[in-house]
């Protein structure tokens, strides 16, 4: 009777915690469903205010009567052109403003750029027509009354309307250009809410069922992870809605897999320790208290390491990269809080039977001290030097291939793993027209320097045409309007011979800027190619500055947690080695298996954050247990027991996290597929090789000195 009274209070607290979590999720869950509506996927919006492309864009807006900028939708009609077919296509294209967007009463005319006309012109080879439909960049970035983004709806309406007239006149139509490519990008990210999330949950559920061999237990950690994701997603939505952070499709996808993976990892650690403690008591509340005491510190340290590493991204010059920092940190903090509150409450409410059919009994038997992990840890203890030398050499061999990794940026057409209509259209456009046709690089110049700048840049690499912006459209058979002058400034439109969003076009920008600045020191070079070049420059700067800051932060956290400088340096060194080994494998696979054209400049940074921060996670889980056991039985015996008792749960956690990130490969986008592969492979490498063999072998080799300067160095 006394035990019943004693247990009633913690049971009531557990019920209260669960009720509170249902209230929290009820508030934030519906907001998570709206997260896609606040996405921003336009590269130009991510640049810092001081970037030249941004400064140019600000001045280019002054040349419009409204606060807008042109965002062209290019429609390529491939086929033999005759006066009759040209007239038919031209007539139809000029009427697209009357098209109504699906599911709304809005017309395309509401989203056309003011002061710019729709135009159609033939290619020099007579085998294609190109329609330029200038959209209002600000208007298409908003939402329709049905809360759907404008741009994909406009692109879809153009495709549906122009296909019949094109085919009737012997043409194959392709909606491409910036609007078509970004519209297809929206479509790819649109799968995040459904396909990515459901697949991630399904994969994690299967792994948990295999790990626990229980038809019931797997539901509890997965439910906790869902509560964490809904809450984190709702918080992120509110921040993005109020323009505090930027959310793009990539950061939303990463948030989903990061929260589910991290929350499940923390849950595996807590449940494993809880099951272990249930073998030593009949009272589940006593067992949970002991388990909680053993895991709260490593979970808090692990989550804090990842969260702080992500927050370092706030130092990025790009707002989308900087936005990923707090987005990921919110996900990790909410995951920790959920697993340290909701999960214990659920486990206590359901009792021991939740482990059925393998219900732990109070038999005083330390079951985890037998089995394959006991054999592995004892084998390493028998010859640690051989173990760390062999694993070190293998990792160094993989790391040597990291120098062949291609991560110097990719164009939008190479961003897709498949071939959507916009990509096919852009490739064909480059066959019949200059690659930059319809989407020029723009130079803002002083009005009295138009001739000088034109002469300076007309023979620059990649430039096929230089024309000033005119004050209005040229009437049929009439004289051309005057050059448009605003506040003593004019705009030169440069047509490049390459796709404007390609790496090659971006490579032409520095020379164009050098020549333009020499002719007019006040000139500003902007446009799509300049934006991509400035984004690439900012990414390279981030790689050089943010990675060292993260390394310093992680070293300090490890030093405080383990009370040892040497152990912090050793652990960090092993994870960095694992990171470069992973990059080496990525280089081999991306170049020779998947055949990717390249990778984003941000790939090394994102891979570093997730691989190093998450890799340190598993070392924290291991070494906090090793430290706990070393205080009781000595360092070498402690590391043997630590590997034995944590081996299964940490490996399971690694498999879960690897599987969740691997799901990113389902999205038809190269950057996410690359990041998913890198994190999945890197996490498995870290859990199976680094944490299981290399770290224990090094600790055995170094001995008690690993704990310097703490008192444990004598154990």
Identify the residue ranges that each predicted region occupies.
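Short coil/turn segments at secondary-structure boundaries
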Residues: 73-74, 390-393, 441
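Short loop/turn and capping residues at structural boundaries
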Residues: 71, 250, 391, 468-469
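Structured non-transmembrane domains adjacent to transmembrane bundles in polytopic membrane proteins
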Residues: 49-70, 80-179, 407-598, 620
